[in-house]
Amino acid sequence: QPVKLTITSPVKVEDVFIKPTLEGATFDLTVKNHSGKKNQFDLYTDIVDKETGSVLYSSLSLQKLVLNADEEKMFTYSVNGLKPRLWTPHHPNLYDFRFRLVTAKGAELDCLSETSGFRTFEVKEGLFFLNGNRYWLRGGNHIPFALAPNDLNLANTFMQLMKVGNIDVTRTHTTPWNKLWMGAADKNGIGVSFEGTWPWLMIH
């Protein structure tokens, strides 16, 4: 498995969960203070179009956040009123979401960047809806993630072949996909039914 070493300040963004809508998103941002003293900081959010580099949003999101020594906390907030280019299998528009922790004096403590898109998928009246529009699933069975989970070239090549064959959706199998394959699916416009390790146990 790939390994990376990350050096950060004691106050660190541990994780973020992005819940997109058609005009914005809600964020669950987990921050931990690894130091032995209380820290105060502000949170800034930047949203940048991955293809064009244009800034969709950049602003101070939360002010004067405080974490005690060795404390971890989740901060939830929303950004609305945006007009993003939506993600679809035919137009897989993506954005870089940057979350910056900044002190009152302007020093950046940490910055986490995640790539995601603006999309919604729901079931209404027995039908599937992508971004509010009725959507007919065109899918295929699981693909060779388990054979080469760290092979980005295989992930991109296989998904591009899927697109040539008019297949826009697949499913995970045996084990959840890692970040590399999920990122390739986002980039290539492939929808994923994310199944658990034992999806068939509760059928009966």
Residue ranges of each PLM-predicted region?
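Secreted/periplasmic carbohydrate-active enzymes, especially glycoside hydrolases
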Residues: 1-192
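Active-site-adjacent "subsite" loops/lids of carbohydrate-active enzymes
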Residues: 138, 199-204
